[in-house]
Amino acid sequence: MFGRSFPFYNSLGGFYPQSLDARKPPGSGYTSKVRVRDRYHIVGFISSGTYGRVYKAIGKNGQKGEFAIKKFKPDKEGEIIQYTGLSQSAIREMALCSELDHPNVVQLAEIILEDKCIFMVFEYTEHDLLQIIHHHTQPQRHAIPALMVRSILFQLLNGLLYLHTNWVLHRDLKPANILVTSSGAIRIGDLGLARLFYKPLNSLFSGDKVVVTIWYRAPELLMGSRHYTPAVDLWAVGCIFAELLSLRPIFKGEEAKMDSKKTVPFQRNQMMKIIEIMGLPTKEIWPGIVSMPEYSQLQSLAMSRAPGHFNRSSNLEGWYQSCLKNNGYSANSSAGTPGADGFDLLSRLLEYDPTKRITAQEALEHPYFKNGGPISANCFEGFEGKYPHRRVTQDDNDIRSGSLPGTKRSGLPDDSLLGRATKRLKE
């Protein structure tokens, strides 16, 4: 799928194998002595976060198409901007996106340095999975079609296989970071937490003690594992698969925050949410669990509950069958339902033991994809509905402005802010 591999020296330092397919088009990468407004017309403001702001733009002067421009904010003290450098997350994202090139990974067009501000220019995507899930939670709307779920999952795993083959862990897969173009192509986005795992100088834990949004965090991370693998991304894919079917997070726990000493607490509530569906993990099904730093906390959690409160065996199949029934999927294996093959894939993605968890390569060869007929590269194919466009506002479209808005997400349409969906914006 990826062709012959060869070593290359990338911008993070060190030699890493890379596929011959991963070649950036001419013009991508770092650009200096260029002004953003000379190359792009700023349409409006999309969203902001701890990293800075994102704007929608249209190319001009030879730059064709729509783009999303990510502006990284400098550190501020009062009214004086302190140029102390970029965050580790921003540097990683720029370095990795400059090297990666795959149809299911977001495409970086260029990086512009202007007046000590960094701008990453990406292809524009009209939707993301969080937006699509919100759309289907509204009254009078139905579940996401089974064929659409299958196409989304296949494309997601295809992009993830590319990352893992090139020694990249994403480490923050969640619906909001899975982008969807207007033509139904899936793009894995937001590589700010991504890391190379080919002979790292330090353990992955030492650089970032907390990775992956809590609802999608693998059990080995919750158990304090210092050395983790691509399996953490596959657990997150399992959580996303379940959420596409049920329209709500399968393990919706509450995160315990770090204390003043920056000590990572045991995520007791999140682990309980997993146990309620997956059963209590034991050394018989996960031998390595006894050596995990938080194993004593897990034992304490189990003993604090009344006997029989936690199932010793998994209730995932019961959850799955209830999900199919409640969302109108057929109970029989057919093109209109995930069926038994869907459950088998889900159970292998949500395997407690990371050494037994299915890989991206194995998942792509699973009967769920093999037995259901051709898979479209357009996840919207056959879907008669219309998803609203990403909301773009004019309130803050001055890309050269020094002021920074508060953290918010403006990418969701108005109707997705109603009812149950409102809570999701606080994750």
From Swiss-Prot:
GO biological process, alphabetically ordered: negative regulation of filamentous growth; negative regulation of transcription by RNA polymerase II; nuclear-transcribed mRNA catabolic process, non-stop decay; positive regulation of transcription by RNA polymerase II; protein destabilization
Family, similarity comment: Belongs to the protein kinase superfamily. CMGC Ser/Thr protein kinase family. CDC2/CDKX subfamily.
SUPFAM superfamilies per the UniProt record, alphabetical: Protein kinase-like (PK-like)
GO terms of molecular function: ATP binding; cyclin-dependent protein serine/threonine kinase activity; metal ion binding; protein serine kinase activity; RNA polymerase II CTD heptapeptide repeat kinase activity
Reaction catalysed by this enzyme: L-seryl-[protein] + ATP = O-phospho-L-seryl-[protein] + ADP + H(+); L-threonyl-[protein] + ATP = O-phospho-L-threonyl-[protein] + ADP + H(+); [DNA-directed RNA polymerase] + ATP = phospho-[DNA-directed RNA polymerase] + ADP + H(+)
Single GO cellular component term: CKM complex
Main location: nucleus
Pfam families for this protein: Pkinase
Enzyme class, spelled out: transferase
Domain (Protein kinase) ranges: 40-369
Residues of the active site: 172
Subunit structure: Component of the srb8-11 complex, a regulatory module of the Mediator complex.
Biased composition (Basic and acidic residues): 390-399
Gene source species: Aspergillus niger (strain ATCC MYA-4892 / CBS 513.88 / FGSC A1513)
Metal-binding is among the record's keywords: yes
Named cofactor requirement(s): Mg(2+)
Binding residue positions for ATP: 46-54, 70
EC number(s) on file: 2.7.11.22, 2.7.11.23
InterPro entries documented for this protein: CDK (IPR050108), Kinase-like_dom_sf (IPR011009), Prot_kinase_dom (IPR000719), Ser/Thr_kinase_AS (IPR008271)
Gene designation: ssn3
Keyword Repressor carried by entry: yes
Described purpose of this protein according to its UniProt entry: Component of the srb8-11 complex. The srb8-11 complex is a regulatory module of the Mediator complex which is itself involved in regulation of basal and activated RNA polymerase II-dependent transcription. The srb8-11 complex may be involved in the transcriptional repression of a subset of genes regulated by Mediator. It may inhibit the association of the Mediator complex with RNA polymerase II to form the holoenzyme complex. The srb8-11 complex phosphorylates the C-terminal domain (CTD) of the largest subunit of RNA polymerase II.
This protein's UniProt keywords: Activator, ATP-binding, Kinase, Magnesium, Metal-binding, Nucleotide-binding, Nucleus, Repressor, Serine/threonine-protein kinase, Transcription, Transcription regulation, Transferase
Location of this chain's protein in the cell: Nucleus
Chain positions covered by the region annotation Disordered: 390-427
Family matches, as SMART domains: S_TKc
Protein name as annotated: Serine/threonine-protein kinase ssn3
